Amino acid sequence: MLSPKRTRFRKQHRGRMKGKSYRGNCICFGRYALQALEPTWITARQIEAGRRAMTRYARRGGKIWVRIFPDKPVTIRPTETRMGSGKGSPEYWVAVVKPGRILYEMGGVSETVARAAISIAASKMPIRSQFLRLEI
């Protein structure tokens, strides 16, 4: 599963997702892509599940690029713990995704295979997303 090798600080503020994605919103590597239409946090497990689903469907053909990386730690307090005594410990990692962000790219396969593989990956995501084709 994806996670940073090391970070400057162990814990982060939650922050807020406003506006749309101006970086990482166009196809750079492959011919087909999955683009997010809503803001959300996508966990490392969800990213990996989508990647595995695409790889399994495409078999050996084609190449897949994961365009998001989970670099934000999410902390969780133990259950039945009283309030106070600091912030919880980091439990898992998320990628902050804004509308317009490209999640996955795919190349080296036909459009029908790419569309099917990307739709399977899209069903693993917690948001609405759309299939994009590189216009040449």
Curated annotation (Swiss-Prot):
CDD domains: Ribosomal_L16_L10e (cd01433). The lineage of its organism: Eukaryota, Viridiplantae, Streptophyta, Embryophyta, Tracheophyta. One of its GO terms (biological process) is mitochondrial translation. GO terms for cellular component: chloroplast; mitochondrial large ribosomal subunit; plastid. Gene3D superfamilies: Ribosomal protein L10e/L16. GO terms for molecular function: rRNA binding; structural constituent of ribosome. It comes from Oryza sativa subsp. japonica. This is Large ribosomal subunit protein uL16c. Belongs to the universal ribosomal protein uL16 family. The gene is rpl16. Part of the 50S ribosomal subunit. Its main location: plastid. It comes from the Eukaryota. The keyword Plastid applies. InterPro entries: Ribosomal_uL16 (IPR047873), Ribosomal_uL16_bact-type (IPR000114), Ribosomal_uL16_CS (IPR020798), Ribosomal_uL16_dom (IPR016180), Ribosomal_uL16_sf (IPR036920). It is found in: Plastid, Chloroplast. Keywords: Chloroplast, Plastid, Ribonucleoprotein, Ribosomal protein. Pfam families: Ribosomal_L16.
